[in-house]
Amino acid sequence: MNDIDKHKKETQTESKNDLNNTTITQNNVSDDCQNQDKINSLKQKILEIKKHISEVKLREQAEIENINKNTKNKIKIIIDTQLENFFRNLIPIIDSLKNIRKDINKYNNIKDNNMIQGIPLILKSLLTVTEKFGLKINNKKGKLFDPKLHTTIPNENCKNINEYYVSEIIQDGYTFHEKIIRKAIVKLSKDKKT
């Protein structure tokens, strides 16, 4: 083989090698692009999963807060119901102590007894404690008659009862956290200052 042929052959071999290298490089670039697409796709999926996990955590936290809030409300309702029932049973005892106090004031000869003098103090202490727990007495004279808070004695003959005022409290009324436990029994008058 002569030098020209030899050179031609080398050039052809180099061209083939260059062509092969170009093909390999193109394949590598193509593979790299495909790999980059896969990586980007996986990164996107990871972001979506993280977002989903974050949303689930927020929903779970909100649900836990709602459960806690509902539980606290239910506990408050149970406690208030029990207190209300307790006060309903206690009110007749308070009435009895008030009646005893009235009787003590009527009869001077029993006022001197130390044990008898303690009854008004017991009553005052009892009313203070019950008020701290939400029991309120409805016993104000001079207020406009309110059928939600008051009941009249059966023989009251008033034509338009809502225009009358409370002149006398026969029996105190009670509310517990704005709920009426017992209406006050009252006498009425047309005059506010009675």
Curated annotation (Swiss-Prot):
Belongs to the GrpE family. It comes from Buchnera aphidicola subsp. Baizongia pistaciae (strain Bp). One of its GO terms (molecular function) is unfolded protein binding. Keywords: Chaperone, Cytoplasm, Stress response. The keyword Chaperone applies. It is found in: Cytoplasm. GO terms for biological process: protein folding. This is Protein GrpE 2. It holds the Pfam family GrpE. Disulfide bonds: none annotated. The lineage of its organism: Bacteria, Pseudomonadati, Pseudomonadota, Gammaproteobacteria, Enterobacterales. Residues 1-17 have a biased composition (Basic and acidic residues). One of its GO terms (cellular component) is cytoplasm. Its main location: cytoplasm. Participates actively in the response to hyperosmotic and heat shock by preventing the aggregation of stress-denatured proteins, in association with DnaK and GrpE. It is the nucleotide exchange factor for DnaK and may function as a thermosensor. Unfolded proteins bind initially to DnaJ; upon interaction with the DnaJ-bound protein, DnaK hydrolyzes its bound ATP, resulting in the formation of a stable complex. GrpE releases ADP from DnaK; ATP binding to DnaK triggers the release of the substrate protein, thus completing the reaction cycle.
